[in-house]
Amino acid sequence: MGVRYSGGLELLSRESQVGVIPLRIISHRGNISGAGHRENHPEQIDFCIESGFDCEIDLWVKDDTLLLGHDFGEYPINLKWLRDRENSLWVHCKNGDALTYLNESNNHKINFFWHEGDRYTLTSSNNVWVYPGRQLFPGSVAVLPELWLDEVRSSEILRCFAICTDYPEKYKKEFEDSSP
């Protein structure tokens, strides 16, 4: 049992010895229904978490200040803000200072990672973050499946731990619609 995705693909659940386990849905930069102008905005991140999604965020550290933003740091936050949401965040460190900061100050409770187009990246929580379109592995995170998923590769996604998408609402709705 799973979710039908463009062309009738089975998606978003996998069988286990204890029944169907839904895939975790991670909002990419706080997006809900496609890329938007409020990406990485703290209020948008909170909205995503309150809506039941995990959230991938982009973190910069400049002059000991924590900032969210994709191409550059825009929105100031602090370590308490991250810790208050640590169970729902996937933190993409955008510069070496952010990576060093989290590695030294967080006791590995906040899940974080670094990559720049790498095919595979291991997060601090030992999940394999897979570049869009690359081969998936059991327990990995499929990034932006809306860009590459087709009927030929649909079975691969069932092995994943999670998907990270700009369309979490769509995937959630499809999952709910296909549940018994």
PLM segments and residue spans:
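Intrinsic disorder/low-complexity segments
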Residues: S6-G8
